[in-house]
């Protein structure tokens, strides 16, 4: 996003507006990853990006030291900007710089100027990449189901402990402003409820292009969560990781009394972990899961598929079960979140 109307905002370094030597800034472009192909809108806090400023004529080497750069954060304009540095590198009639911005909450503006202060209408704007974790509970989790609950299992035993891990990460590895988690009932991840319960919340955070989605679902929440991965992908969101904890929903009876999809899920994901509960001795919750129909996906499709001797209700134990060397689902989820936020593009 550049200045609104170049003719209204041309910045002149000379006091003589009629002089042939007058030089002024026409526009600023960026950020670019490397070359001047297409600027990107969403950036990582952990990388430098290229910016270019263009003038009405070739900038002389002697004038380069007069060129300054500044930044303002979020909704602040140039009056609240901070000076960054002077100069840059001459390149094909423009001046190139590389800047890393790590402060701010959601966005920042880069200014280039020749006068004493930045011009409020000559800037380019960028936004920080964001990531969201959707924790989706099963029957009776977020609200009562058939006279039982709510148990809040996925929130108390999975979401809250994971969010606590997020909060202790070093700032140079993960900025808390870039992560958000949402607690959902399985029925909130169903058909037209997705727009009001999920899409509306995601729209408050970032556009699909600047957002990665992580889905963690238990029981019916795993079944609907797997469907959700396909639905959100169709809406241009990126599904970074899908974690299904003993997903349930294959039997016809449960589809008649629950807001779940009848067809088997066609999941779309970058990485999928499926954990199936198979206790040696069944308890009440295991019989309920059996009646609902435990989903056993094709074992070749998930990146990790393990069977554990935990009861269906023990989502926390499933989530922290070692599945890849010394790593559990929580570790892998954290790694994917950090990898996305740390990637340059």
Q: Where are the predicted features?
A:
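Short, compositionally biased P/S/T/A/G/V-rich stretches that sit at domain boundaries
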Residues: 11-44, 56-58
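Structural beta-strand segments of beta-rich domains
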Residues: 47-51
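Short, aromatic- and glycine-rich surface loops/edge beta-strands on solvent-exposed regions
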Residues: 103-116
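Edge beta-strands of extracellular beta-sandwich domains
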Residues: 117-128
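Active-site catalytic motif of lipid deacylating hydrolases and related acyltransferases
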Residues: 128-211
């Amino acid at each position: 996003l550049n200045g609104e109307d170049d003719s209204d905002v041309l910045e002149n370094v000379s006091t003589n507006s009629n002089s042939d030597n007058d030089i002024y800034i026409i526009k600023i472009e960026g950020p670019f990853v490397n070359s001047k192909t297409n600027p990107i809108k969403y950036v990582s806090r952990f990388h430098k990006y290229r910016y270019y400023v263009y003038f009405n004529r070739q900038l002389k080497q002697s004038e380069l030291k007069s060129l300054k750069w500044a930044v303002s954060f979020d909704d602040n304009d140039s009056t609240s900007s901070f000076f960054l540095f002077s100069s840059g590198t001459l390149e094909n009639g423009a001046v190139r710089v590389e800047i890393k911005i790590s402060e701010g909450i959601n966005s920042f503006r880069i200014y280039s100027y020749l006068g004493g202060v930045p011009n409020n209408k000559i800037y380019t704007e960028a936004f920080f990449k964001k990531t969201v974790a959707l924790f989706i509970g099963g029957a009776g989790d977020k609200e009562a189901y058939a006279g039982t609950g709510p148990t809040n299992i996925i929130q108390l035993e999975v979401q809250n402990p994971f969010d606590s891990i997020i909060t202790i990460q070093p700032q140079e590895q993960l900025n808390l402003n870039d992560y958000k988690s949402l607690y959902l009932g399985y029925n909130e991840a169903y058909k037209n409820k997705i727009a009001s319960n999920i899409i509306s919340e995601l729209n408050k955070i970032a556009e699909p292009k600047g957002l990665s989605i992580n889905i963690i679902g238990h029981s019916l929440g795993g079944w609907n969560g797997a469907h959700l991965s396909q639905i959100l992908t169709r809406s241009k969101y990126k599904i970074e990781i899908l974690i299904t904890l003993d997903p349930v929903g294959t039997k016809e009876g449960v589809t008649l009394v629950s807001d779940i999809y009848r067809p088997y899920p066609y999941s779309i994901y970058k990485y999928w972990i499926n954990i199936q509960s198979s206790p040696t001795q069944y308890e009440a919750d295991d019989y309920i899961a059996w009646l609902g129909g435990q989903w056993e996906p094709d074992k070749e499709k998930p990146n990790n598929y393990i069977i554990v001797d935990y009861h269906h209700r023990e989502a926390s134990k499933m989530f922290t079960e070692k599945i890849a060397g010394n790593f559990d689902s929580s570790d892998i989820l954290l790694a994917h979140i950090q990898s996305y936020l740390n990637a340059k593009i």
